[in-house]
């Protein structure tokens, strides 16, 4: 978590009032435990907190505490995602600045991947399902030289890749690589007009 400045996080929390109704369980606590969920590959709150709470000796150094399952469940349900979105955007901008500073010819890969959400509790996802996917779609702009993502958005699965790509700020001197899902010759022309280049990636 060294890459995330607590001062920046606190600024976001104050701006979005993320801790207003959750004073006993801060945004920092929730962020820590959900990052740990990803790292540990936990698939349920029970297994997640069993693992997380077993490291109680390290909690003090991280500025967190032992967490109850009901507390985390309530926070996941009630706390706005806005603070986490702003933190993510801030980290992506930080990565983007690092990529630009390297001074190399820039290459960006554009792609998307589905996030399946089916079964109990995911009925809401059925209304926007695509032919093969129900859930969400992650759209990613990736800098392979630095091995970091520099932009990420989430949409419903029935949103075409090109629709999200049109919102990207094209950078001069950059080459964009994408598959035929991004084929829109007007958009390709717009890339060319910004003194950038593009390549179509052939799917195997």
Model-identified regions with their sequence ranges:
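Conserved, well-structured functional cores that handle cations and Mg-NTP chemistry
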Residues: 1-204
